[in-house]
From Swiss-Prot:
A Pfam family it matches: Claudin_2
Protein name stated in the entry: Transmembrane protein 178A
Major subcellular site: endoplasmic reticulum
Assembly and interaction partners: Interacts with STIM1.
Taxonomic classification: Eukaryota, Metazoa, Chordata, Craniata, Vertebrata
Organism, scientific name: Homo sapiens
Similarity comment: family membership: Belongs to the TMEM178 family.
Region (Disordered): 41-84
Extracellular topological segments: 26-179, 230-257
Length: 297
């Protein structure tokens, strides 16, 4: 096999691996995870003996869970009916009065991706029981459209407006993340097709075009991943922090799905670099050989 064909085959293999990793990342839900078990244990130690034994593991009243059946009284404040409830709706329904202490906040182990946010099973017995009985939803869809503003109890109007503006900005960050990832997959697929065509037609030209498409995919992936990180940071630093930030002892961080996306980015940049750099390297070698022959003559 000629060196150019070998480089093209290697680039095509890297790009196909990158495509598989990127599709895996997009369609899995383990981009970001939270684990409040350590926080829960510290809260239980601090209030030991204050609650009955069967209530020590409950951090959230049942009325604030995303229930499937008829909504509690507080949920009637939502315009458009109870169908808008999701795992985060307790933030808007409780008001600040119910969140005067960190241990009074409803915190459960969750994992989320681009499309859904779900509870982990097997970590908290209360949420496990409610999910198994069909009372609470295990997963809720992440919104990519702006819904009607939610009326918030016990929160000043200015703060309510700030929360709604933050929701709007967060929605834009999510759209940018999903949009650029979709474009990355489309451009990467085109690059793989062009790299395959290079084995049969205009090898030098098609290899160069495939390299440019691979590098463009890398740019789209970089924008998307950085925007996703910005959306997570923005969400955790929203006001009021008593509602949106996490306590210091809650473990949270990125999970394996986003690492698949970063590995995909590395593979595609390597593939694009090979396709772009090889023609220049080969030309340099040819020029050196010609100069060597001329000098001997």
């Amino acid at each position: 096999m000629e060196p150019r064909a070998l480089v093209t085959a290697l680039s095509l293999g890297l790009s196909l691996c990158s495509l598989g990793l990127l599709v895996t990342a997009i369609f899995t839900d383990h981009w970001y995870e939270t684990d409040p078990r350590r926080h829960k244990e510290s809260c239980e130690r601090s209030r030991a003996g204050a609650d009955p034994p069967d209530q020590k593991n409950r951090l959230m009243p049942l009325s604030h869970l995303p229930l499937r059946d008829s909504p509690p009284l507080g949920r009637r404040l939502l315009p458009g009916g109870p169908g808008r409830a999701d795992p985060e709706s307790w933030r808007s329904l409780l008001g600040l009065g119910g969140l005067d202490a960190e241990c009074g906040r409803p915190l459960f182990a969750t994992y989320s991706g681009l499309w859904r946010k779900c509870y982990f099973l097997g970590i908290d017995r209360d949420i496990d029981t409610l999910i198994l009985k069909g009372i609470a939803q295990r997963c809720t869809a992440i919104k990519y459209h702006f819904s009607q503003p939610i009326r918030l109890r016990n929160i000043p109007f200015n703060l309510t407006k700030t929360i709604q503006q933050d929701e709007w900005h967060l929605l834009h960050l999510r759209r940018i993340t999903a949009g650029f990832l979709g474009m990355a997959v489309a451009v990467l697929l085109c690059g793989c097709i062009v790299a395959t065509v290079s084995f049969f037609w205009e090898e030098s030209l098609t290899q160069h075009v495939a390299g440019l498409l691979f590098l463009m995919t890398g740019i789209f992936c970089t924008i998307s991943l950085c925007t996703y990180a910005a959306s997570i940071s923005y969400d955790l630093n929203r006001l009021p922090k008593l509602i949106y930030s996490l306590p210091a002892d809650v473990e949270h961080g990125y999970s394996w799905s986003i690492f698949c996306a970063w590995c995909s980015l590395g593979f595609i940049v390597a593939a694009g670099g090979l396709c772009i750099a090889y023609p220049f390297i080969s030309r340099t070698k040819i020029a050196q050989l010609k100069s060597g022959r001329d000098s001997t003559v």
